[in-house]
């Protein structure tokens, strides 16, 4: 395999080309990209955990250091001012020397407010990209050049097309997340609480809670019906029914986002439903290809949900077509089939149809779908269908003309299990779809 250093060199060349095009289109001389700053908790003297500007980590795998600055013009070697204070209160990251530093000019920045004297004197034509607009104004950046929408739209659109370096990083993130999922399943099988399962996951991935790309969803039993459940009970339930784990990892700033669901017993209806959702998810991925709208795959999976609702007699005496047409599948899968993935978990540009930022909203029937793009080579997306038993969504169907088609007794029996979600991360190639998750043999 090609080394990360050579892949990174090509990655920088791609970013330089995109930058040249963006600067020419919007008549700017350079972009000043800010890693971000620490922000203190209200009325306190300690900061919130630092989260780096994703446009910054697109260029350099520096994810834990605030007060850094990148100056890029698409022609000259990118210039990185790396924050290196004299500080005996806090850990100070050393000046980096790694696979990527040959392609970036790295300069120590001893004082957070010292960047002003190091930048070009003429700044009227420099664009600022970062989370602290007031800092840009202090540096003399024109207000109209602070996070300019056209530039961001352009950069975001092309972030959809991953370089080989980015794909290599995402495959490494997959490996870490897969290790975590295996450790978490073992912890579940041994009867641990959600809190302790989460610790097992973090230990296996080598992450802290603040390192993972999103808060882990560690849901036992009925908690699996809460789509973004992050509470973490300290006490294990008296009886284990099910375990849904939605948890990822990060490598060089790039995310993995995986979900698996397990039944405590292998011989009940729920266990068979888990298997069937898994099989249908794999069957959908097998149909995916470049040139097709992501929306089409979402709609297709509602048809697959209808098939499972009928097979398991959760909905009765109704055709699968009628279920989808009348949205009886909606309360069982209330979220989208997935989303773009990359530097951010819900990566940017899911609705952008071109590099001018033309927006195509999700269909009115499926408002929570996060992507309406035509699939193209280089895109990375999640495929994460589910079936849930959520009372607040089912309640409106308990009355009315369709109520008789719901097998309420079966639904009540399944509610203690919460729900099911199966999520893989896939790469669209010209002639195939790579399933990074299954390639690592995560069942």
From Swiss-Prot:
PROSITE patterns linked: PROLINE_PEPTIDASE
Catalytic activity: Xaa-L-Pro dipeptide + H2O = an L-alpha-amino acid + L-proline
Keywords: Dipeptidase, Hydrolase, Manganese, Metal-binding, Metalloprotease, Protease
Positions bound to Mn(2+) 2: 246, 257, 423
Pfam families: PepQ_N, Peptidase_M24
Molecular function GO terms recorded: aminopeptidase activity; metal ion binding; metalloexopeptidase activity; phosphoric triester hydrolase activity; proline dipeptidase activity
Enzyme's top EC category: hydrolase
Family that this chain belongs to: Belongs to the peptidase M24B family. Bacterial-type prolidase subfamily.
Domain of life: Bacteria
Cofactor requirement: Mn(2+)
Biological processes, Gene Ontology terms: proteolysis
SUPFAM superfamilies for the chain: Creatinase/aminopeptidase
Transmembrane spans: none
CC per GO annotation: cytosol
Positions annotated to bind Mn(2+) 1: 257, 339, 384, 423
Keyword Repeat part of the UniProt annotation: no
Organism encoding this protein: Escherichia coli (strain SE11)
Record's cofactor remark: Binds 2 manganese ions per subunit.
EC number: 3.4.13.9
Protein name per UniProt: Xaa-Pro dipeptidase
Reported function: Splits dipeptides with a prolyl residue in the C-terminal position.
């Amino acid at each position: 395999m090609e080394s990360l250093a050579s892949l990174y060199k090509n990655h920088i060349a791609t970013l330089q080309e995109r930058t040249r095009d963006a600067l020419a289109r919007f008549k700017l001389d350079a972009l000043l990209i800010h890693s971000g700053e620490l922000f203190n908790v209200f009325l306190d003297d300690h900061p919130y955990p630092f989260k780096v500007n994703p446009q910054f980590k697109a260029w350099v795998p520096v994810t834990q250091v605030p007060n850094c600055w990148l100056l890029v013009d698409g022609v000259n070697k990118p210039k990185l001012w790396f924050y290196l204070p004299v500080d005996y209160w806090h850990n100070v990251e050393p000046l980096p020397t790694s696979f990527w530093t040959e392609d970036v000019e790295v300069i120590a920045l001893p004082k957070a407010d010292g960047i002003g004297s190091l930048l070009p004197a003429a700044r009227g034509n420099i664009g600022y990209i970062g989370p602290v607009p007031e800092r840009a104004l202090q540096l003399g950046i024109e207000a109209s050049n602070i996070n300019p929408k056209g530039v961001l739209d352009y950069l975001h659109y092309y972030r959809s097309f991953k370089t080989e370096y980015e794909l290599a990083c995402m495959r490494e993130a997959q490996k870490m997340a897969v290790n975590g999922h295996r450790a978490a399943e073992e912890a579940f099988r041994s009867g641990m609480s959600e809190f302790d399962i989460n610790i097992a996951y973090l230990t296996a991935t080598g992450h802290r809670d603040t390192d993972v790309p999103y808060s882990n969803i560690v849901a036992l039993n009925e908690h699996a019906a809460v789509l973004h459940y992050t509470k973490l009970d300290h006490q294990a339930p008296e009886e284990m029914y099910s375990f849904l784990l939605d948890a990822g990892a990060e490598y060089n700033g790039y995310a993995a986002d995986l979900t698996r669901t397990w039944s405590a017993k292998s011989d009940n209806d729920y266990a068979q439903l888990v298997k069937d959702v898994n099989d249908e998810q794999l069957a959908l991925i097998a149909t995916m290809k470049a040139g097709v709208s992501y929306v089409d795959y979402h709609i297709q999976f509602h048809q697959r949900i209808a098939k499972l609702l009928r097979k398991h007699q959760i909905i009765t005496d109704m055709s699968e077509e009628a279920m989808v047409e009348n949205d009886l599948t909606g309360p069982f899968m209330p979220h989208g089939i997935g989303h773009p993935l990359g530097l951010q978990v819900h990566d940017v540009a899911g609705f952008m149809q071109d590099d001018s930022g033309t927006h195509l909203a999700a269909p009115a029937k499926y408002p929570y779908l996060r992507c309406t793009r035509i699939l193209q080579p280089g895109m990375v997306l999640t495929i994460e269908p589910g079936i849930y038993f959520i009372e607040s969504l089912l309640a409106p169907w308990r009355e009315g003309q369709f109520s008789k088609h719901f097998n309420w007794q079966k639904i009540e029996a399944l509610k203690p299990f919460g729900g099911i979600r199966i999520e893989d991360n896939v790469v669209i190639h010209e002639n195939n779809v790579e399933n990074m998750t299954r390639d690592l043999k995560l069942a």
